[in-house]
Amino acid sequence: MRSDALEGGLSSLNVVFCSASVGCGHTRASVAVHDALRARGQLAGATFVEALEHAPGWFAGFYRDGYLRAIRHAPRVVGAIYDRTDVPRRDRRPLGSMLDRSEDRILRRFREHLAFTSADVVVSTHFMTTAVLGRMRQRGDLRASLVTVVTDEHPHSVWLHRGCDLTCVASAAARTTAIAGGIDPARVEATGIPIDPKFCMSSPVPFATGESRTPMVLVAGGGHGLGEVEQVVRSMLDSPMRAIVVVVCGKNAELERAMRAIAEARPADAPVELRVLGYTNVMHELMAAADVMVGKPGGLSTTEARAVGLPMVLLRPIPGQEERNADMLVGLGAAVRADRARDAGSIVAGILADPARHWRMRAAASASGRPRAAFDIATRIGALARAGNASDGDRILGRIGA
């Protein structure tokens, strides 16, 4: 770390944010931490580096499209791989070492990005960038302090690297898991998953039977519009409830066209009104106004929902990280699973018809929410900056245990 960064105070920090754009959550987490640092006056400069933009085209295409095809057509295989690879890095040798070397070669242009030479802190919100940067840190190729922000409830071993100066995880349970995976307890903090600071300012609008306000159901199609959204919406339009259903289609133009066609065909006096949005940057307002959210159990979207105390109906979790997220949320009492799309409407109707149940779910979501996680991470980045770089001895220990 540059000496002037310490002498000049926290406001002189240059921070590089690294991720890989597979889905929207990883990038949203980077932006949330950036905005919190900026709000606290800790940024002198910021650079966002998208790893796949600095990789060969064949690799970037395979990485993005291959994963999306796999979760769509072979989710059980994805889950099996997730479970079998959730072991400490030292237990993945020698195959793991070969894959590490291949990854370093493929991402050579990313590793050589000029932004790293002047950075005081590097923040990684994707496990691939964490692995590459962690190895750079251990070799002495990265002088900046390295912070990993895990964007899932469960810190799978691919997120855990002893080259990191700080690993931020979702909860105390996640911290225990990270420590069991070989991370120094002094280098892992239970901060929560960072979300847009706007969620700190969003107050939920409570629904109670007997009020004139029509309850609102938010259907989140996700940044890619994945999932059986059309079936879910039709199940709610056919359900015995009075509600406004707002479906967010993300960047899926085909889904948006289909939803608008359904909405235009609805009679004006239908008990369930359908409203359609494409990609939106006001999810914090929509979630605060909603009474129930229906969507996939992604780490960022469910964290945002909990920040405003929004009960969730979770659609067919993908085996692996989504399954872990869903189990945690259902266990808290903040969510219900809908493993079949056609059941979503009856589940939502049942929640809205039972005010006591709805209130319990809202309270459970709110109690487990950490809307200020991004600010907590910013505080820890500031403390890390004041402490300076890890000692040579620390780096040697990290190299031995990786």
Annotated model-derived regions:
Residues A29, T85-G182, R187:
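Active-site and donor-binding regions of nucleotide-sugar-utilizing enzymes
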Residues L277-G278, A335-A341:
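Short acidic-hydrophobic, aromatic-tinged amphipathic segments that line or gate anion-handling sites
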